[in-house]
Amino acid sequence: MSANENNLIWIDLEMTGLDPERDRIIEIATLVTDANLNILAEGPTIAVHQSAEQLALMDDWNVRTHTGSGLVDRVKASSFDDRAAELATIEFLKEWVPAGKSPICGNSIGQDRRFLFKYMPELEAYFHYRYLDVSTLKELARRWKPEILAGFTKQGTHQAMDDIRESVAELAYYRENFIKL
């Protein structure tokens, strides 16, 4: 497959918390869709190694969630640091989307971008400056047509690839039921 500037890059990170000055990325996943939200390829899902000291800083919610999903064990066993995960992700993306063409796509994606800017700046720079944030449509639906929200339920596994697939499906749902193209 050759890189196509109309393809969309979807990304999700799992982190030890929400503050990029204190917390770290522990999982990254990407996938690529065409402009019509058909999934073309799933990139690597990478647990990013962090020290025991860093993991010990997680709050109760993060400990419970990431231990329960098995992510903490995968992080401890991982040989990928931030840079290796960043480079592996970029190598995958180069096959599908030229640099600087796709907005960063996902749910509440501004939070992920803050972590990319700090810990994976080359990957952050691979994206266009624009955002395609599914949570924007969710917030608009909540205010303008709240009954729409009941039609889509997320599993909320807080595993990066699952979360991305849900974001794509959620946007497709809003396209059909809210935007009505």
From Swiss-Prot:
Keywords: Cytoplasm, Exonuclease, Hydrolase, Nuclease. The active site is at Y129. InterPro entries: Exonuclease_RNaseT/DNA_pol3 (IPR013520), Oligoribonuclease (IPR022894), RNaseH-like_sf (IPR012337), RNaseH_sf (IPR036397). Coiled coil: none annotated. Pfam families: RNase_T. SMART domains: EXOIII (SM00479). 3'-to-5' exoribonuclease specific for small oligoribonucleotides. Belongs to the oligoribonuclease family. HAMAP family: Oligoribonuclease. This is Oligoribonuclease. The lineage of its organism: Bacteria, Pseudomonadati, Pseudomonadota, Gammaproteobacteria, Enterobacterales.
